[in-house]
Amino acid sequence: MRLFLIFTFIVASLASVYGCIPAANPCRGNAKCCGNYVCKNGRCLPRS
């Protein structure tokens, strides 16, 4: 569980640096994924 929190923190800091979450990274809710990706099933996946 602690590892997950650290991981979430890293992703959150990535998002604040890039302004979006890189593809294939974990995301929550309607987080903004980079490029043509959307947050699906907890990950940034290509928009189908």
From Swiss-Prot:
Q: In which tissues is it expressed?
A: Expressed by the venom gland.
- List where the protein spans the membrane: none
**One Gene Ontology MF term:** toxin activity
**Where located?**
Secreted
Q: Which residues form the signal peptide?
A: 1-19
Give the family this protein belongs to, as stated in its UniProt record.
Answer: Belongs to the venom Ptu1-like knottin family.
Protein known as: U-reduvitoxin-Pr5a
